[in-house]
From Swiss-Prot:
UniProt: GTP 1 binding residues: 96-103, 143-147, 205-208
Protein name as it appears in the record: GTPase Der
GO terms assigned for molecular function: GTP binding; ribosome binding
Classification via PANTHER family: GTPASE DER
Binding sites annotated in the UniProt record for GTP 2: 269-276, 316-320, 381-384
Keyword annotations: GTP-binding, Nucleotide-binding, Repeat, Ribosome biogenesis
Region (Disordered): 1-62
Name of encoding gene: der
SUPFAM superfamilies according to UniProt: P-loop containing nucleoside triphosphate hydrolases (SSF52540)
Annotated disulfide bonds: none
Domain KH-like: from-to ranges: 437-519
Protein source organism: Corynebacterium efficiens (strain DSM 44549 / YS-314 / AJ 12310 / JCM 11189 / NBRC 100395)
Biased composition annotated in UniProt, kind: Acidic residues: 1-12, 30-62
Length: 528
């Protein structure tokens, strides 16, 4: 068999570059994103890797090693484990009518721009929780859409979300507009808040100059105590409000909140593919505003949800627009944050509309997930709309457009009817178990000997590269590092990945296979 020719004609199906995994630094092992040989001078740390190529090339290499010896080598490569923490945190809900500056205030409280801010009402449509830290105390800050008692349609749903936030918070911050004064909606909301069984803090926002002190007097008529003059845009007065929030928190929150414990799931896909409907089906409540208009969800919406087997932290994203560069304003920031959501997630559920052809948008989101090295489950939603002709077309699309991810679990669901939703959790658990999984160095090198014996590496530059040794450098995603005497072609790395999956499985997670070229040393330890 002409191994070199067979691999030379093979197309590149899946990128192995794009080191988006934050736990892995390719430069630590002397190779770059394209797996090029390391021609740089070795530093002092390379003294730990003085390999005798003749020993490593022996057929029985490593067979007499104990697991302790393998583990010692792995520790020298800096493999780390990440712990998951649990803690109970209080929640403060930021409420008020539309366009009084709630999201700007949230960004001040959390010290970063996460809540979408635009100078027109209705940008925030869901209630979204952000983690904040003030004076050494951590707590949740919950942003809400604008509340209005007389609205209909999607705006009524937004108002309902604000009411749900008020019902679950430990402290409520009621935001009014100093420049506008008290409106009828403010008065109605104040009467509602006076009946709340938790502390309410009145914040008069847009207090931009001392000349507005006279305007503060009217807010006492709301009956909610002294108003705090604040300019969220300029950062004025926010510290006093945060101090008051901490002072008002109860000793124990209403409900236990888990910060690091649940595994993080990103629900991603193009707009109107059913992400919010799926989240609501899992949560059993109206957690995310749903409407037939594409792009209803603007902010990422986090929900802690108990499914059959585990607690999960679901993140419902805004969906990617056709081209980020053509998006404007709040949609531009929401699209950028979708990328950030993928980076911060552990497993991504990619929702694809099964009733429509797979689009370039679907492919682009998929590429973002695999480049980020995240565990993956592909869910084909709206299966209740499928007919036989469309199923035949979809089978052809899968063969052509998703052939590079045969390792990803595919599930046909309907968020509307609940079809097959019970299959999603086992698929996510399996994907995460493999994403976290590490193969012992002994098992890895036993497999490697067999794979190379069956198909040796192709010639390169008239020389046959020799694979000396392999180790799994990290997890999340699994990264296999091969120490060799020469560069390995991309086709041969794909062959090794296929053989690796045949032996060890690893369904649901991408695998990185990297090459560390060991230069031959002459007498005196100098490179040749």
């Amino acid at each position: 068999m002409d191994v070199e020719g067979a691999f030379a004609d093979e197309e590149e199906l899946a990128p192995h570059g794009g080191w988006a995994s934050k736990d892995f630094d390719p430069s630590e092992f002397g190779y770059d994103d394209d797996f090029a040989p390391d021609d740089s001078d070795e530093d002092e740390d390379d003294d730990d890797y003085e390999f005798d190529e003749d020993d490593f090339a022996a057929p029985d290499f490593g067979e007499d090693y104990t697991e302790e010896e393998w583990e010692e080598l792995e520790r020298s490569l800096g493999i780390e484990r990440r712990e998951h923490l649990e803690e109970s945190l209080c929640t403060v809900a930021i409420v008020g009518r539309p366009n009084v500056g709630k999201s700007t205030l949230v960004n001040r409280f959390i010290g970063r721009r996460e809540a979408v801010v635009e100078d027109f009402p209705g940008v925030t449509r869901d209630r979204i929780s952000y983690l904040s830290d003030w004076g050494g105390q951590r707590f949740w800050v919950q942003d809400t859409g604008g509340w209005d008692p007389n609205v209909k349609g999607i705006h009524a749903s937004i108002a309902h979300q604000a009411e749900l936030a008020m019902a679950s918070a430990d402290v409520i911050v009621f935001v009014v507009d100093t420049k506008v004064g008290i409106t009828e909606t403010d008065a109605v909301m104040a009467r509602k808040l006076k009946r709340a069984d938790v502390p309410v803090i009145l914040v008069a926002n847009k207090f931009d100059s001392d000349s507005q002190w006279a305007d503060m007097a009217e807010f006492y008529a709301l009956g909610l105590g002294d108003p705090f003059p604040v300019s969220a845009q300029h950062g004025r007065g926010g510290a006093d409000v945060l101090d008051k929030i901490l002072e008002s928190f109860p000793e124990e929150p209403r409900a236990k909140s888990i910060v690091e414990g649940p595994r993080r799931v990103a629900l991603v896909g193009k707009p109107n593919v059913g992400k919010s409907s799926l989240l609501n089906k899992f949560a059993g409540e109206e957690r995310s505003v749903v409407d037939n208009v594409a792009g209803t969800t603007v902010d990422p919406v986090d929900s802690i949800i108990q499914l059959d087997q585990k607690m999960w932290k679901f993140i419902d994203t805004a969906g990617l627009r056709k081209k980020v560069k053509t998006a404007t304003g709040h949609e531009f920031y929401a699209s950028l944050r979708t990328r950030s959501v993928i980076d911060s997630a552990e497993v991504c559920v990619l929702l694809i509309d099964s009733s429509e052809p797979i689009t370039e948008q679907d492919q682009r989101v998929l590429a973002m997930i695999t480049d980020a090295g995240k565990a993956l489950v592909v869910a084909f939603n709206k299966w209740d709309l499928m007919d036989e002709d469309r199923r035949w077309e979809l089978d052809r699309e899968l063969d052509l457009q998703l052939a590079h991810i045969p390792w990803a679990k595919r599930i046909n669901i309907s968020a509307k009817t609940g079809r097959a939703l019970q299959r999603l959790e086992p698929a996510m658990i399996e994907a995460l178990e493999n994403w976290d999984r590490r193969v012992s160095t002994g098992q890895l090198n036993n497999w490697l000997r067999e794979a190379i014996a069956a198909n040796p590496p192709p010639m390169r530059g008239g020389r046959l590269p020799r694979v000396l040794f392999a180790t799994q450098a990290s997890t999340r995603p699994p990264v296999i590092v091969l120490f060799t005497t020469g560069f390995l072609e991309a086709g041969y790395r794909r062959y090794l990945e296929r053989k690796f999956r045949e032996r060890f499985g690893f369904n649901g997670t991408p695998i990185r296979i990297a090459v560390r070229v060991r230069e031959r040393r002459g007498k005196g330890g100098k490179k040749q």
